[in-house]
Regions:
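Short, contiguous alpha-helical
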Residues: 3, 7, 11-14, 26-71, ...
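Solvent-exposed, charged/polar functional surfaces in cytosolic regulatory/catalytic domains
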Residues: 8, 12-15, 19, 89, ...
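Surface-exposed helix-capping loop/turn segments at secondary-structure junctions
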Residues: 18-27, 97-107, 143-148
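Alpha-helix boundary/capping residues
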Residues: 20, 47-50, 61, 90, ...
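Acidic/histidine-rich alpha-helical segments that form the ligand environment
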Residues: 74-110, 117-131
Length: 160
């Protein structure tokens, strides 16, 4: 039911996270001037953490990872490689969650941070929230001269 949305999240977010140089993972657009502004790496960590936590709601089980400091997941993950591995794990876990949504259970209420919601609405939130942060990640990337892979022309079209 939500496989295409999750595949799009995987394609867009993972390719952008891979494209950003490792030395830019600790950079925020205006670091030090806005309290709590996430670095690029923290954006990826937050996105992955929320994928884990939202997928756990869909599955009605305890999330494998808690929110950590500032909803950015495990504090010990710092390198680009560690963060990409965490993101890949989150997407795999979410794939299990969206696979569990069926015609028979998609309207069943599940608890969420916003109160009880249909399982399908919570599953849709995986992509919704992911693309909110993907947009922020695109800004970070472009500020550092990185063209998001999704914006690279695939033939005959002009660059975005």
């Amino acid at each position: 039911m939500f496989h295409d949305q999750l595949s799009l999240v995987e394609h867009e977010v993972v390719s952008l996270a891979e494209a950003m140089p490792a030395n830019r993972y600790d950079v925020a657009p205006i670091a030090g001037t806005v309290d709590g502004m996430r670095t690029f790496g923290e954006q990826v960590m937050h996105l992955a953490t929320m994928i884990y936590m939202t997928a756990a709601l869909v599955l009605e089980e305890r999330a494998p990872y808690g929110p950590g400091a500032h909803n950015n997941g495990p504090d010990e993950l710092r390198s680009k490689e560690e963060i990409l591995t965490f993101l890949a794990g989150a997407i795999a876990y979410a794939r299990r969650a969206v696979t569990s949504v069926t015609v028979d259970n998609h309207l069943d209420p599940v608890p969420s941070a916003f109160g009880s919601m249909p399982r399908a609405a919570v599953a849709a939130g995986i992509a919704f929230h992911s693309f909110n942060h993907y947009g922020q990640m695109v800004v970070y990337a472009r500020m550092h001269g990185v063209t998001p892979p999704a914006s690279v022309p695939t033939g005959g079209e002009s660059p975005a």
